[in-house]
């Protein structure tokens, strides 16, 4: 099968390595990139220029987008998508001028449609939080193909999932077809994994970041690379690279170690400790911007409005405990957190307070799409979530449509905890997950080791086998 890897960030090296491994297994790999560095690495790995689609700012400026806009309208009608929705999900493109964002989307659509059609792409693999990825999902599916979104399994284990859409809702079925078909070994693994969660163990990437970010040689190196090279040079051709303005004001990832220390006294004044004997709803803020918020809960990206609407729904005598994401301190400024703290009934809890202790004491744990609701379900505690993702499959997790429904959920009869059903559901997720990691090499260099690359290729190969077995044709022309 012909497959395409889409990437605009640091996973690209992993995709190139996995593509080479899949080529050795008889498949043909193609790439869509936005950075010259990644294009050169794909070429150096032996993939010819015809195998790599490079999307650039210059290409969008030069493109005649009249016909492309008409084609986008046809795709919207055929696939039930909205391009404006995609632009707003895209943390980089939504900060651009509206006319430029639409021009870039039209250019990307035309280039992708031609590339996918020319190479008869049957599977697209990528990170669905940007316009090229979201359009590729729609285009490939429109011609009968598949889309796979690799994400770390949100449990304390070295496994990952291949979801079948932009949402972490349904995995590609490469193991047990239903929870009732899981094996005794998978059930035992699920039991052990649940026990690890209820002992307080976190996901690997969260557990590795339990201390405030350090300002040292590594930080200074990243700062120099970001400000002096990427922001000033790479951003000239790559839409998906922060500029100086966005690094300082919008996507403030580089600023978190500085802000964490610069504002230390303010944090001490803002944050509170839980109060013994107090009834409360626990709401954990998402790391932002991130896929779990931008794509899986796009209607609720305004943190203040979400907290205000939860708070106004709660009865007297029940507090709302709001806890900042511990790795996100410095992304949200003190002014925003101060506004949240001043809302009636709200306590802004110290980010370093143990979330598991709060989960076990809370009347209800709420998140937009966060792992904290999954952890609450592992304890059999009442939970709520505002997105259509896999966490709603656990017995004590309630799907809400809006923040102001939290109060009604709190007063509703509690959902029955069905531990055996939950265990089978977790075993089913494990059965359809894969060993290895898809974390960026900058975070986990072992992701590029041959053994892990082989595991990624194994997982994608299973999806290809599944697609081939279903004999779904991929030669139907797309509505482009």
Please place each PLM-identified region on the residue numbering.
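Conserved nucleotide-sugar donor-interacting segment of glycosyltransferase catalytic cores
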Residues: 110-173
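Leloir-type glycosyltransferase catalytic cores
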Residues: 171-225, 396-480
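Short loop/turn segments at strand-loop or loop-helix junctions that form parts
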Residues: 34, 57, 152, 278-290, ...
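Conserved N-terminal ligand/cofactor-binding loop architecture of enzyme catalytic domains
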Residues: 21-112, 152-261
